[in-house]
From Swiss-Prot:
The lineage of its organism: Bacteria, Pseudomonadati, Pseudomonadota, Gammaproteobacteria, Aeromonadales. Residues 7-16 have a biased composition (Basic residues). Residues 25-34 have a biased composition (Polar residues). GO terms for cellular component: large ribosomal subunit. One of its GO terms (molecular function) is structural constituent of ribosome. Residues 1-54 are annotated as: Disordered. Keywords: Ribonucleoprotein, Ribosomal protein. This is Large ribosomal subunit protein bL32.
Length: 54
């Protein structure tokens, strides 16, 4: 197994973790029903990009 030779500094640890942050879900408002939904997802009543898909 690989074992590190030298201790990683707080700065290096922080640089590694800089890409780990989560982003909030992007929300959109449907043009037909005015309902809020996640981007690129079907609304709860079955509309996607203004068309009934479900």
């Amino acid at each position: 197994m690989a074992v590190q030779q030298n201790r990683k500094t707080r700065s290096r640890r922080g640089m590694r973790r800089s890409h780990d942050a989560l982003t909030a879900a992007q929300l959109s408002v449907d043009s037909t029903s005015g309902e809020t939904h996640r981007r690129h997802h079907v609304t709860a009543d079955g509309y996607y990009r203004g068309k009934k898909v479900i």
